[in-house]
Amino acid sequence: MRRIGIAALAAAALTYGANAQAQKKYGPQGVSDTEIKIGQTMPHSGPVSVYGIMGRVHMAYFQMVNERGGVNGRKVTLISADDAFSPPKTVEQTRKLVENDGVFMMFGSSSTAGQSAVQKYLNAKKVPQLMLSTGASKFNDPKNFPFTTPILQLYSTEGEVYAQYLMDTKPDAKVAILMQNDDFGRD
């Protein structure tokens, strides 16, 4: 039994060792034997800078992950770039993160309009655009955008739930809808 355990451990070490060597040479951008580099765009300044707190929470989370040994022994480095809630700035910062900083993926970025502006670019580059802080239906399209995944429920689903609640509990209620005139509001 002990020989089988030692043989299994040796086989696993050789397998993972070979994978680590291959990764040095052939691995994806932003991933090395010691680090996983990820990026995000957040409104750390501008009209909705209060949402920048999400980026700081993500930084704290990955700091905790790193203090506990990282991911498979790799340190996670999150670069949180300020897009000031401006789609042109989102495009600029995303390109910098991918092309200059060499991030493996984009994680937890916010702004429906900003993420709409970079969705095609990131999918064309095959850079994962994961856990987007938006519920716009355009980000739930794996056939056309396989590298994009939102974290929030779809806004249309949320609207249906609210409408059903009103119909069930206040059937005579008058409803007003306010929207902002951009991708977020139109969805």
Question: What is the predicted role of each segment?
Answer:
Residues 75-100, 158-161:
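Structural motif
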Residues 35-37, 73-78, 174:
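Residues at or immediately flanking beta-strands
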Residues 61-71, 166:
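Flexible, small-residue-rich helix->loop connector segments that border functional cores
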Residues 88, 102-187:
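Extracytoplasmic ligand/sensor domains, especially the bilobed periplasmic-binding protein
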Residues 40, 61, 93, 135, ...:
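Hydrophobic alpha-helical segments typical of transmembrane helices
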